[in-house]
């Protein structure tokens, strides 16, 4: 079984502050953000709602995608989220299926 890597987007609320990250354990990483265990941007701006994620088999591809998304215009990021999550639902509770 190959290792999985995830690029994820957290939001403070619908159309709110966005944070993009990469991890090899999405459940643990989002939980850390939600519990305030990671000092910095997400804790400071209360960004803890998982609104989008993508899965990769190759860590280099995941990191490349994260860097590309971080350079995107805000409008493009919002459109990406809304393509798969129109209501901006928190996807964290659905993570037990991955």
Residues of each region from the PLM?
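GIY-YIG nuclease catalytic motif and its immediate N-terminal context
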Residues: 1-38, 43-53, 60-67, 84-86, ...
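An amphipathic, aromatic/His-enriched active-site/gating alpha helix that lines ligand/cofactor pockets
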Residues: 64-82
């Amino acid at each position: 079984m190959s290792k999985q890597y995830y690029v994820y987007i957290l939001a403070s609320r619908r159309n709110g502050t966005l944070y993009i990250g990469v991890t090899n354990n999405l459940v643990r990483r989002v939980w850390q953000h939600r519990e305030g265990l990671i000092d910095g941007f997400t804790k400071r701006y209360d960004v803890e709602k998982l609104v989008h994620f993508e899965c990769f088999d190759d860590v280099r591809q995941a990191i490349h995608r994260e860097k590309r998304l971080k350079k995107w215009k805000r409008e493009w990021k919002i459109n990406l989220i809304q393509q798969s999550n129109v209501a901006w639902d928190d996807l964290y509770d659905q993570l037990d299926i991955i």
